[in-house]
Amino acid sequence: PIYACTEYDTPAEIADDGTTNTGISTKIHRKVLWINIDGAVGEVVKNSLPADGAIAKMLKNSKYSWTGVSDNRTLSVERNEDPVTWATMLTGVIPEKHSITDESYTANVEYNPNNPNEKVIHYQNIISYISNNDVNMLSLCVTPWAKLNKNMLNNAKTTITSENDVQTRDVVLNHIANEDYTFILADFSGML
């Protein structure tokens, strides 16, 4: 099956972001904090969260999903960096569509050079989508994967290759405190 996080309940606290009867705008400026834990499917993370932890406290005011398009993917050989899964998560389409197979993060698409009118479809990743559609939407990506950062997340305003999970956490918290990012992607190898 194919999953995506397009259907979820909106918490009552954030459901209405229009204007009140007083005419004062209550428009909420939505932000995205994408926390990725390498190798962990959503249900495992959900069941491992401490009830009093920071993430659990954020959930009541959040839209989120514990299911993703890569949850059913298993690797025949475990690798440090998994370009196929990253491309699947960041483009929102299955590997057979995005055709990314290696750390170049370039689609491996076959086309006929004798047919200049042949249509080749490339799937934009979320960072490219953000940077191409609103230059004022600032994005931060912190992962330990240098090739992912260089080849797929390079359109973010700030992309940082971290040395470990503690550095990822500290960098993200520092940027949250000091800058106004609309989208933040933080990648961890485990649950701190």
List the predicted regions and their residue ranges:
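Loop/turn elements at helix/coil->beta-strand transitions in domains of secreted/extracellular proteins
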Residues: 28-33, 56, 60-67, 84, ...
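Active-site-proximal beta-strand/loop segments in catalytic clefts of secreted hydrolases
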Residues: 35-40, 69-73, 92-93, 103-105, ...
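Active-site nucleophile/metal-coordination loop of metallo-enzymes that catalyze phosphate/sulfate
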Residues: 13-27, 42-129
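Catalytic-adjacent loop/helix segments of enzymes that bind and process anionic phosphate/sulfate esters
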Residues: 117-123, 134-135, 140-192
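Boundary/entry segment of secreted carbohydrate-active catalytic domains
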Residues: 29-34, 38, 44
